[in-house]
Amino acid sequence: MHCPFCRHPDSRVVDSRTTDDGTSIRRRRQCPDCSRRFTTVETCSLMVVKRSGVTEPFSRTKVINGVRKACQGRPVTEDALAQLGQRVEEAVRATGSAELTTHDVGLAILGPLQELDLVAYLRFASVYRAFDSLEDFEAAIAELRETTGHPGEEDDTGAGSQENDRGPTGAGQVPEPAGAAD
């Protein structure tokens, strides 16, 4: 490893530690020429093959940014997004493969996102699975109801029998235009 200060072609490892998340090793190094110390971080490279065939390094930041779009307007914190990003990275690294497809990464996102927020899950799944009809959404919602055990709409208040602002059937009501009742 070249010294970043004097460009000497060698350095000595003084200390090595695994990072808190266990995905990389932090090494303190010392240059034998100028005696200055510097830190390096060593990680195992994980490559993602995109649909176009282009290969690029896996990026937790890209995962978080993609999920952030699906969570827009939802009560999801930045901390929760960071944890989701870490879970996704751990899942794709656990496969043991050095190369993954974008499809594999998308599948790794869906599980943790479903646990985080069902609406964000549907938004992400609609893009990831390329929903192009209402039936695709209905099938995804039916699948969610089966897997999560929600027979009807999700209700945070716990009062499942109460009417909501959508009326007694739960269907959205279309407001009448002004002057239509005249």
Curated annotation (Swiss-Prot):
State the phenotype upon gene disruption.
Cells up-regulate expression of nrdRJ and nrdABS transcription. A mutant in which amino acids 1 to 41 are deleted is unable to bind zinc and also unable to bind the nrdABS and nrdRJ promoters. A mutant in which amino acids 151 to 182 are deleted is able to bind to both promoters to the same extent as the wild-type. Functional zinc-finger and ATP-cone domain are required for binding to the promoter regions of both sets of RNR genes.
Tell me the cofactor note.
Binds 1 zinc ion.
Q: Tell me where on the tree of life, at the top rank, the source sits.
A: Bacteria
A GO molecular-function annotation:
zinc ion binding
Keywords annotated in UniProt: ATP-binding, DNA-binding, Metal-binding, Nucleotide-binding, Repressor, Transcription, Transcription regulation, Zinc, Zinc-finger
- Residues forming the ATP-cone domain are 46-136
| A Pfam family of this chain | ATP-cone
Ranges in a coiled coil: none
Which cofactors?
Zn(2+)
A Gene Ontology biological process in which this protein takes part is: negative regulation of DNA-templated transcription
Q: What InterPro entries does the record tag this protein with?
A: ATP-cone_dom, NrdR-like_N, RNR_NrdR-like
Q: Which family does it belong to?
A: Belongs to the NrdR family.
* Miscellaneous notes: Seems to be allosterically activated by ATP/dATP.
Cited HAMAP family: NrdR (MF_00440)
In the record's own words, the domains note is: The ATP-cone domain may function to recruit ATP/dATP to elicit a conformational change in NrdR that is necessary for binding.
* Role played: Negatively regulates transcription of nrdRJ (class II RNR genes) and nrdABS operon (class I RNR genes) by binding to NrdR-boxes which are proximal to or overlap with the promoter regions of class II and class Ia RNR operons, respectively.
The molecule here is called Transcriptional repressor NrdR
